[in-house]
Amino acid sequence: MSAANPETPNSTISREANTQSSSAATSQGYVLPEGKIMPNTVFVGGIDVRMDETEIRGFFARYGSVKEVKIITDRTGVSKGYGFVSFFNDVDVQKIVESQINFHGKKLKLGPAIRKQNLCAYHVQPRPLVFNHPPPPQFQNVWSNPNTETYMHPPTTMNPVTQYVQAYPPYPNSPVQVITGYQLPVYNYQMPPQWPVGEQRSYVVPPAYSSVNYYCNEIDPGAEVVPNECSVCEATPPSGNGPQKKSVDRSIQTVVSCLFNPENSRLRNSVVTQDDYFRDKRVHHFRRSRAVLKSV
Protein backbone atom coordinates (compact mmCIF):
# COMPACT_ATOMS: atom_id res chain seq x y z
CA MET A 1 0.00 0.00 0.00
CA SER A 2 2.77 2.34 0.91
CA ALA A 3 4.69 1.48 -2.26
CA ALA A 4 1.71 2.51 -4.40
CA ASN A 5 1.91 6.06 -3.17
CA PRO A 6 5.56 6.86 -2.79
CA GLU A 7 6.29 10.31 -1.36
CA THR A 8 9.69 11.85 -1.87
CA PRO A 9 11.14 14.80 0.03
CA ASN A 10 11.21 16.89 -3.14
CA SER A 11 7.47 16.50 -3.66
CA THR A 12 6.85 17.48 -0.07
CA ILE A 13 8.93 20.66 -0.42
CA SER A 14 7.17 21.62 -3.66
CA ARG A 15 3.73 21.11 -2.10
CA GLU A 16 4.75 23.16 0.90
CA ALA A 17 6.16 25.91 -1.30
CA ASN A 18 2.96 26.08 -3.32
CA THR A 19 0.92 26.26 -0.13
CA GLN A 20 3.07 29.04 1.24
CA SER A 21 2.92 30.93 -2.07
CA SER A 22 -0.87 30.82 -2.15
CA SER A 23 -1.20 32.13 1.38
CA ALA A 24 1.71 34.58 1.30
CA ALA A 25 -0.37 37.50 0.13
CA THR A 26 -2.62 37.30 3.22
CA SER A 27 -0.07 36.55 5.91
CA GLN A 28 -1.26 38.34 9.07
CA GLY A 29 -2.92 41.02 6.95
CA TYR A 30 0.37 42.21 5.36
CA VAL A 31 0.89 42.47 1.63
CA LEU A 32 4.02 40.49 0.82
CA PRO A 33 6.34 41.34 -2.07
CA GLU A 34 6.64 39.06 -5.06
CA GLY A 35 9.55 36.67 -5.18
CA LYS A 36 10.74 33.17 -4.45
CA ILE A 37 9.58 31.77 -1.11
CA MET A 38 12.40 30.09 0.79
CA PRO A 39 11.35 26.74 2.25
CA ASN A 40 11.69 26.05 6.00
CA THR A 41 12.55 29.69 6.68
CA VAL A 42 10.52 32.17 8.71
CA PHE A 43 10.76 35.94 8.68
CA VAL A 44 10.76 37.43 12.17
CA GLY A 45 10.04 41.12 12.62
CA GLY A 46 9.74 43.34 15.67
CA ILE A 47 12.97 42.06 17.26
CA ASP A 48 14.03 44.17 20.20
CA VAL A 49 17.59 45.44 20.36
CA ARG A 50 18.04 43.56 23.62
CA MET A 51 17.39 40.20 21.89
CA ASP A 52 20.32 38.20 20.57
CA GLU A 53 20.53 35.22 18.22
CA THR A 54 20.93 32.72 21.07
CA GLU A 55 17.64 33.67 22.70
CA ILE A 56 15.78 33.56 19.40
CA ARG A 57 17.28 30.16 18.57
CA GLY A 58 16.15 28.73 21.94
CA PHE A 59 12.67 30.15 21.55
CA PHE A 60 12.02 28.72 18.04
CA ALA A 61 13.52 25.32 18.92
CA ARG A 62 10.04 24.21 19.98
CA TYR A 63 8.94 24.20 16.31
CA GLY A 64 11.83 22.13 14.98
CA SER A 65 15.60 21.86 14.76
CA VAL A 66 16.89 25.40 14.12
CA LYS A 67 19.56 25.56 11.45
CA GLU A 68 20.44 29.26 11.51
CA VAL A 69 19.31 32.54 13.05
CA LYS A 70 20.25 35.72 11.22
CA ILE A 71 19.55 39.21 12.60
CA ILE A 72 19.97 41.97 10.01
CA THR A 73 22.16 44.84 11.17
CA ASP A 74 23.37 48.06 9.60
CA ARG A 75 26.97 49.04 8.90
CA THR A 76 27.55 50.05 12.48
CA GLY A 77 26.33 46.69 13.81
CA VAL A 78 23.03 47.97 15.20
CA SER A 79 20.05 45.66 14.72
CA LYS A 80 17.43 46.78 12.19
CA GLY A 81 14.68 44.97 14.12
CA TYR A 82 14.13 41.96 11.88
CA GLY A 83 15.78 38.66 10.97
CA PHE A 84 15.31 35.12 9.65
CA VAL A 85 15.09 31.70 11.27
CA SER A 86 15.73 28.59 9.14
CA PHE A 87 15.09 24.93 10.10
CA PHE A 88 16.79 21.68 9.14
CA ASN A 89 13.67 19.57 8.92
CA ASP A 90 10.42 20.21 7.13
CA VAL A 91 8.26 22.40 9.32
CA ASP A 92 4.83 23.88 8.85
CA VAL A 93 5.80 27.48 8.19
CA GLN A 94 2.17 28.55 7.76
CA LYS A 95 1.32 27.26 11.23
CA ILE A 96 4.20 29.19 12.75
CA VAL A 97 3.20 32.37 10.90
CA GLU A 98 -0.44 32.18 12.04
CA SER A 99 0.47 31.70 15.69
CA GLN A 100 0.56 34.71 18.00
CA ILE A 101 4.02 34.81 19.55
CA ASN A 102 4.98 37.27 22.27
CA PHE A 103 8.62 37.41 23.22
CA HIS A 104 9.84 39.52 26.16
CA GLY A 105 6.44 41.13 26.26
CA LYS A 106 6.60 42.16 22.60
CA LYS A 107 4.55 40.68 19.76
CA LEU A 108 6.65 39.36 16.89
CA LYS A 109 5.70 39.85 13.27
CA LEU A 110 6.04 36.56 11.43
CA GLY A 111 5.84 35.70 7.77
CA PRO A 112 7.33 33.55 5.03
CA ALA A 113 10.85 34.39 3.89
CA ILE A 114 10.93 35.72 0.32
CA ARG A 115 14.14 35.96 -1.68
CA LYS A 116 14.37 38.74 -4.25
CA GLN A 117 17.52 39.80 -6.11
CA ASN A 118 19.59 37.37 -4.03
CA LEU A 119 18.41 39.05 -0.84
CA CYS A 120 15.90 37.83 1.70
CA ALA A 121 13.21 40.39 2.39
CA TYR A 122 9.76 40.39 3.90
CA HIS A 123 8.01 43.70 3.43
CA VAL A 124 10.81 45.85 2.09
CA GLN A 125 10.89 46.13 -1.70
CA PRO A 126 14.04 47.79 -3.04
CA ARG A 127 13.45 50.59 -5.48
CA PRO A 128 16.04 52.22 -7.70
CA LEU A 129 17.07 55.66 -6.64
CA VAL A 130 16.37 58.32 -9.23
CA PHE A 131 18.32 61.55 -9.04
CA ASN A 132 16.92 64.50 -10.91
CA HIS A 133 19.91 66.47 -12.05
CA PRO A 134 19.26 70.18 -12.42
CA PRO A 135 19.22 71.38 -16.02
CA PRO A 136 22.31 73.21 -17.20
CA PRO A 137 22.08 76.98 -16.92
CA GLN A 138 20.84 78.66 -20.03
CA PHE A 139 21.30 82.24 -21.07
CA GLN A 140 19.04 84.22 -23.32
CA ASN A 141 20.22 87.03 -25.54
CA VAL A 142 18.47 90.18 -24.36
CA TRP A 143 18.96 91.90 -27.73
CA SER A 144 17.24 89.26 -29.85
CA ASN A 145 13.65 88.17 -30.20
CA PRO A 146 12.38 86.48 -27.00
CA ASN A 147 10.79 83.74 -29.12
CA THR A 148 14.14 82.52 -30.37
CA GLU A 149 15.92 79.60 -28.75
CA THR A 150 18.27 80.09 -25.86
CA TYR A 151 21.99 79.53 -26.14
CA MET A 152 25.17 79.87 -24.12
CA HIS A 153 26.09 83.53 -24.04
CA PRO A 154 29.81 84.15 -24.66
CA PRO A 155 31.74 86.35 -22.25
CA THR A 156 31.50 90.02 -23.06
CA THR A 157 34.76 91.54 -24.29
CA MET A 158 35.24 94.94 -22.77
CA ASN A 159 37.21 97.73 -24.44
CA PRO A 160 39.90 99.03 -22.05
CA VAL A 161 39.42 102.60 -23.37
CA THR A 162 36.63 104.73 -21.85
CA GLN A 163 34.19 102.12 -20.58
CA TYR A 164 30.90 102.62 -18.84
CA VAL A 165 29.45 99.44 -17.30
CA GLN A 166 25.76 99.44 -16.46
CA ALA A 167 24.38 96.48 -14.51
CA TYR A 168 20.68 95.82 -14.98
CA PRO A 169 18.85 94.26 -12.00
CA PRO A 170 17.72 90.70 -12.77
CA TYR A 171 14.10 90.31 -13.72
CA PRO A 172 11.96 87.77 -11.81
CA ASN A 173 12.04 85.34 -14.74
CA SER A 174 15.56 86.12 -15.85
CA PRO A 175 18.06 83.32 -15.05
CA VAL A 176 21.13 85.50 -14.99
CA GLN A 177 22.24 89.09 -14.67
CA VAL A 178 23.56 90.60 -17.88
CA ILE A 179 26.24 93.27 -17.75
CA THR A 180 26.54 95.34 -20.90
CA GLY A 181 29.51 97.56 -21.63
CA TYR A 182 29.14 100.81 -23.52
CA GLN A 183 31.95 102.81 -25.03
CA LEU A 184 31.53 106.54 -25.13
CA PRO A 185 32.71 108.01 -28.46
CA VAL A 186 35.51 110.54 -28.19
CA TYR A 187 35.04 113.81 -30.04
CA ASN A 188 37.89 116.20 -30.76
CA TYR A 189 36.81 119.82 -31.00
CA GLN A 190 39.13 122.50 -32.36
CA MET A 191 38.03 125.82 -30.93
CA PRO A 192 39.33 129.05 -32.46
CA PRO A 193 41.40 131.21 -30.12
CA GLN A 194 39.44 133.79 -28.14
CA TRP A 195 40.96 137.24 -28.43
CA PRO A 196 40.09 140.20 -26.22
CA VAL A 197 37.51 142.64 -27.47
CA GLY A 198 39.01 145.32 -29.65
CA GLU A 199 41.84 143.28 -31.12
CA GLN A 200 41.56 141.76 -34.56
CA ARG A 201 43.95 139.11 -35.70
CA SER A 202 43.60 137.29 -38.96
CA TYR A 203 45.63 134.16 -39.55
CA VAL A 204 45.46 131.88 -42.51
CA VAL A 205 45.69 128.20 -41.51
CA PRO A 206 47.06 126.26 -44.48
CA PRO A 207 45.43 122.92 -45.34
CA ALA A 208 47.45 119.71 -45.43
CA TYR A 209 49.12 119.68 -48.82
CA SER A 210 51.81 117.46 -50.13
CA SER A 211 55.36 118.70 -50.20
CA VAL A 212 55.60 121.30 -53.01
CA ASN A 213 58.67 123.33 -53.95
CA TYR A 214 58.26 126.80 -55.35
CA TYR A 215 61.04 128.38 -57.42
CA CYS A 216 61.83 132.07 -57.61
CA ASN A 217 64.07 133.28 -60.45
CA GLU A 218 64.80 136.62 -58.81
CA ILE A 219 67.02 135.18 -56.05
CA ASP A 220 70.76 134.89 -56.33
CA PRO A 221 71.87 131.36 -55.28
CA GLY A 222 75.16 132.66 -53.94
CA ALA A 223 73.66 135.33 -51.72
CA GLU A 224 73.66 134.98 -47.97
CA VAL A 225 70.27 134.67 -46.29
CA VAL A 226 69.78 136.92 -43.28
CA PRO A 227 66.73 136.42 -41.00
CA ASN A 228 64.61 139.48 -40.44
CA GLU A 229 62.10 140.39 -37.77
CA CYS A 230 58.72 141.43 -39.02
CA SER A 231 56.61 143.76 -36.99
CA VAL A 232 52.97 142.91 -36.45
CA CYS A 233 50.50 145.74 -36.06
CA GLU A 234 47.40 145.06 -34.02
CA ALA A 235 44.23 147.00 -34.66
CA THR A 236 42.79 149.29 -32.00
CA PRO A 237 39.13 150.13 -31.44
CA PRO A 238 38.00 152.87 -33.84
CA SER A 239 36.39 154.82 -30.98
CA GLY A 240 39.63 155.15 -28.99
CA ASN A 241 42.27 157.83 -29.55
CA GLY A 242 45.17 155.98 -27.90
CA PRO A 243 48.39 155.03 -29.68
CA GLN A 244 48.51 151.92 -31.78
CA LYS A 245 49.91 148.75 -30.25
CA LYS A 246 52.97 147.27 -31.83
CA SER A 247 54.47 143.89 -31.12
CA VAL A 248 57.24 141.87 -32.62
CA ASP A 249 56.35 138.36 -33.74
CA ARG A 250 59.61 136.47 -33.44
CA SER A 251 58.03 133.28 -34.76
CA ILE A 252 58.14 134.68 -38.28
CA GLN A 253 61.88 134.68 -38.81
CA THR A 254 62.07 132.89 -42.08
CA VAL A 255 63.91 133.12 -45.34
CA VAL A 256 60.73 134.22 -47.08
CA SER A 257 60.62 137.46 -45.06
CA CYS A 258 63.74 138.59 -46.89
CA LEU A 259 62.31 137.85 -50.31
CA PHE A 260 59.85 140.72 -50.23
CA ASN A 261 62.17 143.16 -48.47
CA PRO A 262 63.35 145.86 -50.96
CA GLU A 263 66.78 145.87 -49.38
CA ASN A 264 67.39 142.24 -50.37
CA SER A 265 66.32 142.44 -54.01
CA ARG A 266 69.64 141.01 -55.10
CA LEU A 267 68.69 137.45 -54.04
CA ARG A 268 67.99 135.21 -57.02
CA ASN A 269 67.29 131.58 -57.92
CA SER A 270 66.52 130.33 -54.34
CA VAL A 271 64.28 127.39 -53.50
CA VAL A 272 61.14 128.22 -51.47
CA THR A 273 59.40 125.43 -49.51
CA GLN A 274 55.70 125.04 -48.78
CA ASP A 275 55.93 126.34 -45.19
CA ASP A 276 57.89 129.41 -46.31
CA TYR A 277 55.32 130.10 -48.97
CA PHE A 278 52.41 130.24 -46.51
CA ARG A 279 54.37 132.25 -44.00
CA ASP A 280 55.13 134.70 -46.77
CA LYS A 281 51.43 135.09 -47.41
CA ARG A 282 50.91 135.76 -43.69
CA VAL A 283 53.49 138.61 -43.80
CA HIS A 284 51.68 140.16 -46.73
CA HIS A 285 48.43 139.94 -44.84
CA PHE A 286 49.93 141.75 -41.82
CA ARG A 287 51.37 144.47 -43.99
CA ARG A 288 48.12 144.99 -45.81
CA SER A 289 46.27 145.24 -42.49
CA ARG A 290 48.74 147.89 -41.36
CA ALA A 291 48.21 149.87 -44.55
CA VAL A 292 44.45 149.80 -44.08
CA LEU A 293 44.73 151.01 -40.49
CA LYS A 294 46.99 153.90 -41.49
CA SER A 295 44.57 155.01 -44.16
CA VAL A 296 41.74 154.99 -41.63
Swiss-Prot record:
GO terms for cellular component: cytoplasm; nucleus. Testis specific. Keywords: Cytoplasm, Developmental protein, Differentiation, Nucleus, Phosphoprotein, RNA-binding, Spermatogenesis, Translation regulation. Residues 40-115 form the RRM domain. It comes from the Eukaryota. GO terms for biological process: 3'-UTR-mediated mRNA stabilization; cell differentiation; positive regulation of translational initiation; spermatogenesis. Residues 167-190 form the DAZ domain. Its main location: cytoplasm. The modification Phosphotyrosine is found at residue 277. Residues 1-25 are annotated as: Disordered. Residues 80-132 are annotated as: Homodimerization. It is found in: Cytoplasm; Nucleus. Residues 1-18 have a biased composition (Polar residues). One of its GO terms (molecular function) is mRNA 3'-UTR binding. Homodimer and heterodimer. Forms a heterodimer with DAZ. Interacts with BOLL, DAZAP1 and DAZAP2. Interacts with PUM2 Multiple DAZL RRMs can bind to a single RNA containing multiple GUU triplets. Belongs to the RRM DAZ family. The DAZ domain mediates the interaction with DAZAP1 and DAZAP2. RNA-binding protein, which is essential for gametogenesis in both males and females. Plays a central role during spermatogenesis. Acts by binding to the 3'-UTR of mRNA, specifically recognizing GUU triplets, and thereby regulating the translation of key transcripts. This is Deleted in azoospermia-like. It comes from Callithrix jacchus (White-tufted-ear marmoset).
